[in-house]
């Protein structure tokens, strides 16, 4: 009951209550949106940061040409055994430089003839290259080359099994010999950007074992 001298404020109170509830809902909605946007920005920032770090890390690994952390040159068989036993070592790959290629007919490449074992190839080298076609050499007369070397040889469309003639020397000999090899594989590598066009001609274990020269001081342990 409302007396004559009283004002009926019930409708006003209801309107104020509804308006207050509406504003409260808006504030809650804005708060939720702000939280969602904040969470999104934080997640996006971390994602971009991690992606940048991973990209940078991959670029550095590719420029180095191996995932190994350190290389120890001129190691002996006994030293290799002791290194492999260490709890601090994840794996050990073997690299052996056998000789070099006569690159006088090429533009500016400097190529070493190199053999690496399965660990070095699969765990240290493969992660740093791309566009791999074919396989690592297995026969005595097989080689594997990076595409930039093939291009300097005038080969723009390499084919597995194609013949490639190389003039090369082995060990400390200054006598160059010429042989015809078969291309077992090719790939894209990135170390020439760091090494001023130094590269590798990968050869097989069979080729290495066929050499009648001492290569005792040419073994490098690649440690990760």
Identify what each model region corresponds to.
Residues 4-15, 35-41, 102-107:
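Short, mixed-charge, low-aromatic patches
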Residues 23-32, 37-65:
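Alpha-helical transmembrane segments
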Residues 1-30:
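Feature of multi-pass inner-membrane transport and sensor proteins
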Residues 50-224:
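Basic-flanked hydrophobic alpha-helices used for secretion and membrane insertion
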């Amino acid at each position: 009951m409302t007396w004559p001298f009283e004002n009926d404020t019930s409708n006003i109170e209801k309107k104020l209550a509804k308006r207050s509830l509406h504003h409260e809902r808006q504030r809650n909605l804005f708060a939720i949106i702000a939280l969602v946007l904040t969470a999104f920005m934080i997640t996006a920032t971390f994602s971009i940061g991690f992606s940048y770090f991973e990209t940078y890390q991959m670029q550095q690994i590719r420029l180095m040409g191996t995932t190994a952390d350190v290389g120890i040159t001129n190691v002996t068989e006994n030293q290799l055994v002791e290194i492999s036993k260490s709890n601090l070592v994840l794996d050990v790959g073997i690299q052996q430089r056998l000789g070099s290629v006569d690159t006088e007919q090429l533009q500016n490449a400097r190529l070493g003839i190199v053999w690496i074992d399965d660990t070095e190839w699969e765990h240290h080298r493969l992660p740093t290259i791309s566009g791999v076609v074919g396989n690592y050499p297995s026969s005595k007369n097989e080689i594997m080359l990076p595409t930039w070397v093939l291009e300097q040889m005038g080969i723009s469309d390499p084919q597995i099994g194609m013949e490639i003639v190389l003039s090369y020397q082995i060990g400390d000999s200054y006598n160059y010999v010429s042989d015809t090899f078969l291309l077992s594989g090719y790939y894209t590598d990135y170390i020439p950007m760091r090494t001023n066009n130094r590269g590798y001609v990968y050869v097989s274990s069979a080729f290495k074992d066929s050499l009648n020269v001492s290569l005792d001081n040419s073994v490098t342990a690649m440690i990760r």
